[in-house]
């Protein structure tokens, strides 16, 4: 797969469930798989969705062995998408080497749906105001230290619930979790000027980190809180 299809790497779902009677056995198995992948392509990503009661001790060890670990900080980004800046809007966990953080994922609610339902002030009713926060919210994540992920259609402000369905797009029903969703192509999202503006701005933000000023994001950056 790495050579024939040129994939970038692998993500292991629920890696804390790997066979083994001890945590050491699980981490040894993960290390074995990681070494096998790196033997084929030393630049390949090897990402673990590693939760469980021992993740606090497991994950630093796995990261020290060259792997990356999934870390869910979606609640903080949902808060800022909705315009609520309380204690829940804390990005500190998204600012760490070795932890893949994200605003949205296949398991979590869409930020723009949350903003549409629970947004502060006019964000709940003003679509343009909501969508103008899409690129800003992504910048809050991808410009921090460490690896980050962008989930599909996040960049155009997809705003139907993870619990919606194509047949009843406005109905919230947990039975629809894995149902087919309204298509952004059918909805005309890629013809929307304001949505494509967010798409372009997010691409520029990512290029700032990866192509224009990569040296700024390498090493150990200085972090400071600036008030006033």
Q: What do these predicted regions represent?
A:
Residues 1-21:
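Active-site groove signature of glycoside hydrolases
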Residues 9, 45, 151:
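Hydrophobic "anchor" residues on beta-strands that sit immediately upstream
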Residues 14-103, 108, 130, 139-143, ...:
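Active-site-proximal helices and loops of the catalytic beta/alpha 8
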Residues 88, 119-138:
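Aromatic-anchored helix/helix-loop segment that forms the rim or "lid"
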Residues 110-112:
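Short, solvent-exposed loop/turn elements at domain surfaces
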Residues 114-116:
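Short acidic, glycine/proline-rich loop/turn micro-motifs
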């Amino acid at each position: 797969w790495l050579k024939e299809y040129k994939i970038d790497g692998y993500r292991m779902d629920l890696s804390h469930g790997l066979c083994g009677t001890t945590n050491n056995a699980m981490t040894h198995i993960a290390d074995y798989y990681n070494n096998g992948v790196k033997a084929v392509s030393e630049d390949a990503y090897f990402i673990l969705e590693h939760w469980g009661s021992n993740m606090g001790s497991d994950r630093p060890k796995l990261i020290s062995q060259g792997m990356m670990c999934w870390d869910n900080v979606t609640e903080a980004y949902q808060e800022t998408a909705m315009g609520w800046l309380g204690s829940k809007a804390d990005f500190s966990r998204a600012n760490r080497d070795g932890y893949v953080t994200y605003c949205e994922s296949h398991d979590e609610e869409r930020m723009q749906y949350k903003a549409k339902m629970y947004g502060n002030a006019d964000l709940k009713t003003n679509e343009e105001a909501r969508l103008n926060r899409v690129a800003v919210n992504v910048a809050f994540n991808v410009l921090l230290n460490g690896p980050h992920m962008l989930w599909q259609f996040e960049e155009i402000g997809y705003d139907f619930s993870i619990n919606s369905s194509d047949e009843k797009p406005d109905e919230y029903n947990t039975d629809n979790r894995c149902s087919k969703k309204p298509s952004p192509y059918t909805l005309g999202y890629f013809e929307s000027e304001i949505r494509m503006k967010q798409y372009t701005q997010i691409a520029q933000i990512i290029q700032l980190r990866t192509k224009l000023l990569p040296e700024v994001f390498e090493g150990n950056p200085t972090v400071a809180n600036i008030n006033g």
